Regions:
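Extracellular beta-rich repeat passengers
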Residues: 1-234
Length: 234
């Protein structure tokens, strides 16, 4: 599970996954080809009804060291770029500004997605401002040329949106409230996340029936995780 403080974001934009093959985007082996399954990304909007993706709001609050450290904005649940071939299956992302960026600024990531060299399958998004964006720091779900830094056609959805919905089992929900409870990550009774996972064609995983990190009845974090370490007396 990935859970972020809504008032702390990286100066270079905060993402759930930010996957590169190499810094300059070179389309060379060995490729980044990790495969992730059953991830739950809890975005900044889920547990903060007042969230604003703005530097005036993202101040780090009481945890700001006041040493000049720069903060930034939240961006995407998944940014796959620079020739990465990262795969993700049976996972859910909730309440991010952007769901997916297949970033074509450097390298061959866009072409790799078209050639089926990486896959996003049985991935559910909910409560995004934009399902997809085609470039870093572009928050519009519009078809965009990341190399030449211009919109191709603002009447069309982003390529990232098109790719997301072309993949088997992917779905989008307007709100996460039909998926998870008030804690932001546990599936509620009857949640669409339950009973729909698929591992067909994927090896090396314990096959479970649910999408995301939790099955709705067993919170494996209980007893050993702490969400308030600053105020805990050890």
């Amino acid at each position: 599970m990935a859970l972020r403080d809504s008032k702390i974001a990286d100066t270079s934009q905060s993402n759930g996954f930010e996957s590169d093959n190499c810094a300059d985007g070179a389309d060379v082996q060995p490729y980044t080809t990790a495969t992730f399954s059953n991830i739950t990304f809890v975005g900044p909007k889920v547990l903060d009804a007042n969230f604003q993706n703005d530097p005036d709001y993202i101040t780090a609050g009481a945890y700001n060291p006041n040493n000049g450290s720069a903060l930034g904005k939240f961006q995407a649940a998944m940014q796959i770029r620079r020739s990465s071939h990262l795969n993700c299956i049976n996972s859910v992302a909730l309440g991010w500004p952007v769901g997916l960026i297949v970033d074509g600024e450097k390298g061959g990531t866009v072409q790799a997605s078209k050639d089926g060299l990486f896959k996003l399958q049985n991935v559910y998004f909910a409560g995004m401002d934009a399902v997809g964006s085609d470039a870093n720091k572009i928050y519009k779900d519009k078809l965009y040329d990341a190399v030449n830094k211009k919109f191709i056609d603002e009447s069309q959805k982003s390529y990232s949106n098109t790719f997301f919905f072309s993949q088997p089992g992917n779905k989008y929900f307007d709100s996460w409230s039909s998926l998870v409870g008030l804690d932001g990550y546990t599936p509620i009774a009857g949640s669409p996340l339950l009973g729909v996972a698929s591992f067909t064609g994927w090896n090396g995983f314990d096959n479970v029936s649910y999408i995301g990190a939790f099955d709705g009845s067993n919170n494996w974090m209980s007893g050993w995780t702490n969400f308030d370490p600053q105020n805990t007396q050890y």
